[in-house]
Amino acid sequence: PGAAYAAAVANGESERAWIRRVVLLLTGQAFSLLGSNIVQYAIWWWIVLQTKTGSAMLLATLFGVVPQAIVSICGGSWADRHSRKLLIMLPDMVIAVVTVVLSLSFAMGWASLTMIFVVLFIRSAGGGVQTPAVQSFIPDVVPSGKLLRVNSIYGVINSVNMIVAPAVAAVLINTVPLWSILL
């Protein structure tokens, strides 16, 4: 079992208390991932609608995906050596700050494709740190006999998210300004 789970049992905590922690973690991640992906897809939809060029969309996709793929290679080892909670929360805060800055830039008419690409890059790199940390954190709070089930639920959450987020973003981008979606 995970270290946090074993410590909780050693301190007399109910074995079923892990369920509360897992529900909080997975619920938080579900909403965080959904919001983050809606923002990502809304930005991509906005770029397509505004530029009408495949090259701008290609660059947006590269800046929005490649950094996460590269950073996540190291993200797993960082999660093994550093505080997983910090590696989950810190990138989330950085992502939130740069997204709010982009939102304000759109609201004030200052946004540019370059700024969007920089924000996509930062958001993607943050995801490359956060995602492996979450995946490494789950075994810490789940009994080993329940790990497969919880990981399966986490996988379903991610799969549903990948279906729902683009659709929600498409509806939103056609009904409200991008700056409000980013908030």
Spans of model-derived segments:
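Alpha-helical transmembrane-bundle signature of multi-pass membrane transport and export proteins
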Residues: 1-183
